[in-house]
Amino acid sequence: MEKILKVKSFLCDGKRVNLIEPISILVKNNIVNFVTAENSEYGVYVSDATEEGIKKKIIARLCYLYKGFAEVTDISLLMFLDSYTDPVLLTGMLRNAWLSNIESVVPENEKS
C-alpha cells in the first residue's frame, strides 16, 4: 500500500489547527513519512496499518510537534534518512517548519 495524504488541518487537544499549506504525508506499508517545506523527511512506524490506525498516528504526531516536544525519549520512534543528522536538532527543525505553517488555531466547538 502506498499513497500520499495531504493534511490541511488537524485536531489537537480540542482545537483545530489550520495550516497555510497542506503537509504531504507518504504512507508506504507500515511507515508514515512526513515531508516539510524544506524537504526534511522522517518516518514513523505504524503497527496498526489500517486507515484508522494511520490517521490516529498522523494526528498524534502533528499534535506532538504542534505542542513543541522534542524529547530524546521519542527519538526511537523516528527513523532518519540522513544518519549523520542530530535527531534532536532535526526534530526541532521539523517542529519549527510545522509551526511556521500554522495559519490559525480555533477551539473545535466554535463554528468557523
Name the predicted role of every residue range.
Residues 1-26, 32, 52, 56-112:
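Short, charged, surface-exposed hinge/linker loops at domain edges
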Residues 27-29, 38-39:
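Short, contiguous, helix-prone interaction/anchoring segments in small proteins
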Residues 33-36, 45:
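General beta-strand recognition
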Residues 40-53:
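A short, exposed loop/beta-hairpin motif centered on an aromatic-Gly-Thr core
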